[in-house]
Amino acid sequence: MKITGQEVTIVMIEDDEGHARLIEKNIRRAGVNNEIKAFADGTSALDYLLGADGSGLVSAHRQLLVLLDLNLPDMTGIDVLSKIKGNTHLKRSPVVVLTTTDDSREIQHCYDLGANVYITKPVNYDSFANAIRQLGLFFSVMQVPEAN
């Protein structure tokens, strides 16, 4: 995935190592070779996205796509999503929510906050693998908007 010649960095925020490996494997299988920055908690991901000063200026010229689990060990994915979409420098970055939560109110809340896609991770491994393969296909046709 490129934007005007600039590579898009995929930021994966997923605390389950097995899920993270499966997601990356299927993204690669779909032919997407972009850099993947993996984080197992919201704090380290936000440090990367917002920078030490928390302003987000560090991401002003980055082309990012965020894969976000809602169930993180240190904060909720909703908190992470709110900070991303509430930041001037990050708000146009696409966010794909990938989580086991299928509560319709929580799904709507994610969309209300600015999530671009919400994918429910099945608990069953084969179903989960299939959902991630579909995510890989999604990546193969997706374009990321340019940063301002």
Predicted regions mapped to residue ranges:
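Non-catalytic signal-transmission and effector/linker regions of two-component phosphorelay proteins
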Residues: 1-11, 17-37, 41-46, 50, ...
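The feature encodes the CheY-like receiver
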Residues: 73, 103
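Conserved phosphotransfer cores of two-component systems
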Residues: 56-61, 85-92, 113
